[in-house]
């Protein structure tokens, strides 16, 4: 049996911004844009160090060689392709203070990414609170990507 790819997630570290956030591929298709925003919105609700406000849709020609952009062009339009960027040094907490990343906080982000997949695909156990160590509502403006024309 052949399975269809539904989502591609490329994970990178970065040194010039705090938090974790995503780059998504730009699209003019409103329905596809809304679908693309779902995974980052869910991760934002599951992870205190993820910033939906910093998440951007991007079609920068300099990024043509990235996995997200290359696979976005090669695969069917229904496949969501993301780059998850994670800071080398810190996230910003609800009081706008920098909180240094530790091995534990990186592991917590990984756990929250897994929980987000469970939420996205409505997998059994996704609502089980024993798996959820931290959730938040830090970002009040969840209406649009930071630079991509989604709303």
Where do the model's predicted regions map?
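Structured catalytic-domain cores with a bias toward divalent-metal coordination
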Residues: 1-151
């Amino acid at each position: 049996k052949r399975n269809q790819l539904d989502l591609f997630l490329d994970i990178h570290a970065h040194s010039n911004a705090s938090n974790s956030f995503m780059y998504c591929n730009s699209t003019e298709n409103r329905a596809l844009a809304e679908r693309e925003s779902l995974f980052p919105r869910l991760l934002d609700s599951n992870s205190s160090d993820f910033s939906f406000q910093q998440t951007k849709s991007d079609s920068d020609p300099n990024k043509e060689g990235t996995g997200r952009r290359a696979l976005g062009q090669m695969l069917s339009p229904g496949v969501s392709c993301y780059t998850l960027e994670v800071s080398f040094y810190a996230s910003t907490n609800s009081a706008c203070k920098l909180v240094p990343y530790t091995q534990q906080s990186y592991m917590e982000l990984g756990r929250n990414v897994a929980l987000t997949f469970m939420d996205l695909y409505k997998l059994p156990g996704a609502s089980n609170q024993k798996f959820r160590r931290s959730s938040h509502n830090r970002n009040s403006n969840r209406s649009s990507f930071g630079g991509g024309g989604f709303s």
